[in-house]
């Protein structure tokens, strides 16, 4: 008799509500100290996340679906086989509007140029964050549409 798949609950929540809720065999994300992967029965963890991609493997074998979600910072908590990501912003790859993401990238690049010309450090920092968010959304969209 085959061993039952070891799946756990993965939830992604933003200030706008629940964005994602499924069972999976692993969740991978970028934490502030590097890339992380959580599997069934992982030790409890609470760690901050950076702008990056969250990948959820929906089943134990490589042929199972992988969901891609763009997140813009937040935290992940894992305990009792439940992973909860509380993100500043999150968007599933299937919901990303590529033209809007590319337009946001162009706007951010223009703001970076403007901030450098004006020597405005605050504007530069905000524009660099906006650029990282836009590039992340484009990357996550591309991961789904390979």
UniProtKB/Swiss-Prot annotation:
One of its GO terms (cellular component) is plasma membrane. One of its GO terms (molecular function) is ATP binding. It is a peripheral membrane protein. Pfam families: ATP-synt_DE, ATP-synt_DE_N. The keyword DNA repair does not apply. It is found in: Cell membrane. Keywords: ATP synthesis, Cell membrane, CF(1), Hydrogen ion transport, Ion transport, Membrane, Transport. NCBIfam families: ATP_synt_epsi (TIGR01216), PRK00571.1-3 (NF001846). This is ATP synthase epsilon chain. It comes from Lactobacillus delbrueckii subsp. bulgaricus (strain ATCC 11842 / DSM 20081 / BCRC 10696 / JCM 1002 / NBRC 13953 / NCIMB 11778 / NCTC 12712 / WDCM 00102 / Lb 14).
């Amino acid at each position: 008799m085959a061993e039952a798949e070891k799946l756990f609950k993965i939830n992604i929540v933003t200030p706008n509500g629940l964005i994602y809720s499924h069972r999976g065999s692993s969740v991978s994300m970028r934490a502030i100290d590097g890339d992380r992967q959580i599997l069934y029965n992982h030790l409890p963890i609470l760690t901050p996340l950076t702008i990056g991609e969250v990948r959820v493997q929906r089943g134990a074998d490589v042929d199972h679906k992988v969901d891609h979600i763009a997140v813009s910072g937040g935290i992940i908590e894992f305990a009792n086989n439940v992973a909860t990501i509380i993100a500043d912003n999150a968007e599933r790859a299937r919901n990303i509007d590529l033209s809007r993401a590319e337009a946001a990238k162009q706007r951010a690049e223009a703001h970076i140029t403007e901030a450098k010309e004006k020597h405005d450090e605050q504007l530069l920092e905000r524009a660099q964050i906006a650029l990282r968010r836009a590039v992340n959304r484009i990357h996550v969209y591309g991961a789904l549409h390979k």
